[in-house]
Amino acid sequence: MAKFKIKTGDLVQVITGKNKGEQGKVLRVITETSRVVVEGVNVVTKHKRANAQGEAGGLVKSEAPIHISNVMLGDPETGKPTRVGYRTETVERDGKQKTVRVRVSKSTGKDL
């Protein structure tokens, strides 16, 4: 299973494809297929059939997943897409020293 720099809840921008330039929050990361579901991006219309429990059928709009290589993490300071780096910090928890990796914006150097 691959490790991704984009996590659920991140603000991302689509950098290629039919939704290029659109921004949204990551709702879900699908690691098996290397895809992400972004709020308000790549919206598709599906036909839903009415079922026996009384739910009405009709057209349902939902976000379809897009490949993770087509999105870039947005810098919280500038709002522009940025590359992601890591910095290690030592943090003291319960009297013990722990090393923690922190995601950092390559363009501004700020924590993400």
Curated annotation (Swiss-Prot):
This is Large ribosomal subunit protein uL24. One of its GO terms (biological process) is translation. Belongs to the universal ribosomal protein uL24 family. It comes from Kocuria rhizophila (strain ATCC 9341 / DSM 348 / NBRC 103217 / DC2201). PANTHER family: MITOCHONDRIAL RIBOSOMAL PROTEIN L24 (PTHR12903). Keywords: Ribonucleoprotein, Ribosomal protein, RNA-binding, rRNA-binding. Part of the 50S ribosomal subunit. It comes from the Bacteria. Gene3D superfamilies: 2.30.30.30. NCBIfam families: rplX_bact (TIGR01079).
